[in-house]
Amino acid sequence: MTDYELYYWSVPFRGQFVRAVLAYADKTWTEGGDAAILKLMEGPVRKMPVPFMGPPLLIDKKADFAIAETPAIIHYLGETLDLMPATAALRAMTMKVVNDASDVIDDITLDGGREMWTKKRWQDFTPRLEKWMSLWEETGRRHGLKADWGYLLGGGEPGIADVVSATLWSTMTDRFEKIDAMLEETAPMTAALTRRVAELPSLAKLAAKAKQDYGDAYCGGQIEASLRKVLGD
């Protein structure tokens, strides 16, 4: 029996943060699948494992506990798998990074596809994306990050902040060359950290599985098609 059951769509996107933390912690999980997600979402709230509006949703089988919302899931995994930093300040910073990462992917999909990308919208958005990248760069700098060593919040080994950051940027830059070039120019230490952490065996294996399972898909749907159109990918 696997340790967890994860409900997320058949794309990387937001669910990849949860998958990455599970993989990094060497935990096993099954994926509920798109049909099961729709059935839960369209069914009565009283029958949901936990009241939720949309995935990701994670069920801890051993604990018989279900939780939704990406930051809440990652906080739960961090606490129960002993992956959180020792101090309250660094735990708070870890969750800030997780929430920032969630905000970035909301931005990159125009709040889940409420609008579609046009060249003008992308041009107007570029400074904001560069600012997001600079936030990562400055966070790392304040905690001793260098181009060839160190971690986002310091310490001697990768933490959740590093795993989530590497997943955010590598999933995006692997699929969009222009964003890759932007990250290299705007936040070179973050780009280097992303490569180092993404090359960890567990995360490299997960990325390879995502390519096998989802191809080049990022978030899917019309919003991804419009993003690829403005980026020329």
Give the positions of each predicted feature:
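GST-like domain detector, emphasizing the conserved glutathione-binding G-site
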Residues: 2-131
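Exported/periplasmic ABC-transporter solute-binding proteins
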Residues: 203, 208-210
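GST-like fold's C-terminal all-alpha helical module
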Residues: 89, 96-199
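Conserved alpha-helical elements of sugar-nucleotide-dependent glycosyltransferases
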Residues: 13-17, 189, 202
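Acidic/histidine-enriched, glycine/proline-rich intrinsically disordered or flexible terminal extensions
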Residues: 210-233
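Basic/polar N-terminal segments that are highly enriched at the extreme N-terminus
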Residues: 1-3, 232-233
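Active-site-flanking alpha-helical
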Residues: 78, 169, 207
